[in-house]
Amino acid sequence: MIIFPAVDIQNGKAVRLKQGRAHESTVFAESPVDAARAWEEAGARWLHVVDLDGAFDGAAQSRRIVRDICAALAIPVQLGGGIRDMHTAEAYLEAGVSRLIIGTLALEQPTLFADMCRAFPGRVGVSLDAEGGRLKSRGWVEDTGMTVDTALPRLLDDGAAFVIYTDIERDGMQCGVNVAALEHLARLSTVPVIAAGGVATLEDIQKLYPLTLETSLMGAVSGRALYEGTLDLKEANAWIDARKNTPESA
């Protein structure tokens, strides 16, 4: 199981939102690069970066910052937010991003998403962001009318290499994870699934861990909880590592 610390970029700073609302942001670091370095030093094995300006505006806004983050780290980076054409996808991969997270484009332009998956095999995943069971797009402000059950089969057929599932109502609220929804998705999916939204404490990691042994769940993104200290990255990684060689993990 991998824990992905989140660095969300808005107006050049590292922030966290509540339930994806752009006007409810908390600045946690003036420099996203410094925040990224701090998570690597704390033991992060992957970094999860989101260009929030790109997600809301529909165009890549933070390419220079993302490039600087990738150059500063030895660990791989996955990136989402504002990737809505092939040129932007290619530019971010050339900048050092290991894999891309596609949301709006995957739901609204299936042919282009499939082309992107073919062009960059194994490096393009999909973000499924749900509120009340329905998937949202365009920075979580538009209701697509789709659900996980209706959207996932086509996205897998298109070539999605992994899935990130965000429970919007729990994102940034530190209220715990929606284990039932995650388990449902992780049993449907044939590619790795990453949980996001509400991962707030070591107890949440402990609730999710059994699913990594039984389903396609492979990790969890956490942001505000790591910044505010309700989840300690070193402690969580140590807890996971202690179970790698136990009988239940064999």
From Swiss-Prot:
<dbReference type="GO" id="GO:0000105">
    <property type="term" value="P:L-histidine biosynthetic process"/>
</dbReference>
<dbReference type="Pfam" id="PF00977">
    <property type="entry name" value="His_biosynth"/>
</dbReference>
<comment type="pathway">
    <text>Amino-acid biosynthesis; L-histidine biosynthesis; L-histidine from 5-phospho-alpha-D-ribose 1-diphosphate: step 4/9.</text>
</comment>
<keyword id="KW-0413">Isomerase</keyword>
<comment type="similarity">
    <text>Belongs to the HisA/HisF family.</text>
</comment>
<dbReference type="InterPro" id="IPR006062">
    <property type="entry name" value="His_biosynth"/>
</dbReference>
<dbReference type="InterPro" id="IPR011060">
    <property type="entry name" value="RibuloseP-bd_barrel"/>
</dbReference>
<dbReference type="InterPro" id="IPR013785">
    <property type="entry name" value="Aldolase_TIM"/>
</dbReference>
<keyword id="KW-0963">Cytoplasm</keyword>
<dbReference type="InterPro" id="IPR023016">
    <property type="entry name" value="Isoase_HisA-like_bact"/>
</dbReference>
<dbReference type="GO" id="GO:0000162">
    <property type="term" value="P:L-tryptophan biosynthetic process"/>
</dbReference>
<feature type="active site" description="Proton acceptor">
    <location>
        <position position="8"/>
    </location>
</feature>
<dbReference type="GO" id="GO:0003949">
    <property type="term" value="F:1-(5-phosphoribosyl)-5-[(5-phosphoribosylamino)methylideneamino]imidazole-4-carboxamide isomerase activity"/>
</dbReference>
<keyword id="KW-0368">Histidine biosynthesis</keyword>
<feature type="active site" description="Proton donor">
    <location>
        <position position="129"/>
    </location>
</feature>
<keyword id="KW-0028">Amino-acid biosynthesis</keyword>
<dbReference type="InterPro" id="IPR006063">
    <property type="entry name" value="HisA_bact_arch"/>
</dbReference>
<dbReference type="GO" id="GO:0005737">
    <property type="term" value="C:cytoplasm"/>
</dbReference>
<dbReference type="InterPro" id="IPR044524">
    <property type="entry name" value="Isoase_HisA-like"/>
</dbReference>
<protein>
    <recommendedName>
        <fullName>1-(5-phosphoribosyl)-5-[(5-phosphoribosylamino)methylideneamino] imidazole-4-carboxamide isomerase</fullName>
        <ecNumber>5.3.1.16</ecNumber>
    </recommendedName>
</protein>
